[in-house]
Amino acid sequence: ATKKFTIKILKHKKNLGLGRALKTGFEHCFSIGKNDDILISMDTDNSHTVNLSYQMAKKISSNKQDLVIASRYQLTSKTKGLNKLRKILSFGAAILYKIFFPIKNVKDYTSGFRAFRLEKIRNAWKLDKNFFSEKGFSASADILIKLYKVRHKIRFGEMPINLRYDLKKGDSKMKIFK
C-alpha cells in the first residue's frame, strides 16, 4: 500500500532565521496534525536525502522511537563537501553538548534532519510557550535539550546520514563567529 504525504510550503516574507522557520512550521503542524502523525524537519538545500525520511518515519511508526535524528556521527555516516574548520567546530560542539546534556542514544545535537512523533513534541510545546525561543542555528540543539528536560519518556534515536554539502544550493547562512 502506498502512503501519501502532505507537503505544505510555508514562507516568511524575509529571512527570520532557522529558529523562526522551525517555529512557524511546527506550530502549523500542531494546529492541523493528529497525535499519531510524524513531523519531519530537514534542510531543503539538497544536502539532506529525502529518502532517509521514510526510514526515520518507519522507526517512529513501528513504535521504537519518538524522535529520530539523521546523525553525522554514526559509524556508517558520511559527510562530503564540508570544510575542515566546520567539521572540527561541529565535532567540538557535539562533544560539549554530550558532556552538558547527556541524552541517551544521541550524538548529533545540531542536525536539523529529524523525525518527531507529533504528540510528544506538541505536549512539550504546550508546557512551555517559549519552546521555540532560539532564532538562529542553535534552535535545533535548543529543541532537543528542551525535549530532554521535559522527560515525557521520549525515546531518542539516530540513523546514519550521507550528508552532501557538495550538492548544497546557496551559501551557508551560519555565522561561526558573531
Regions flagged by a language model, labelled:
Residues A1-L10:
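Acidic donor-binding segment of Leloir-type glycosyltransferases
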Residues K3-K4, Q55-K58, I103, L127-K178:
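Hydrophobic helical membrane-anchoring modules
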Residues T6-I7, I38-I40, D66:
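The start of beta-strands in P-loop NTPase/AAA+ ATPase cores
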Residues H12-S31, V50-S133, D166-M174:
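Acceptor/aglycone-binding surface of glycosyltransferases and processive sugar-polymer synthases
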Residues G25, D45, R117, L147, ...:
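Residue-level signature of catalytic and energy-coupling elements of molecular machines
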Residues K34-D36, K64-D66, H152-I154:
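Short, high-confidence coil segments that cap the C-terminus of an alpha-helix
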Residues N35-S47:
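Short beta-strand-to-loop acidic/aromatic patch adjacent to the donor-nucleotide binding site
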Residues M42, S71, N162:
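Conserved residues at the C-terminal ends of beta-strands
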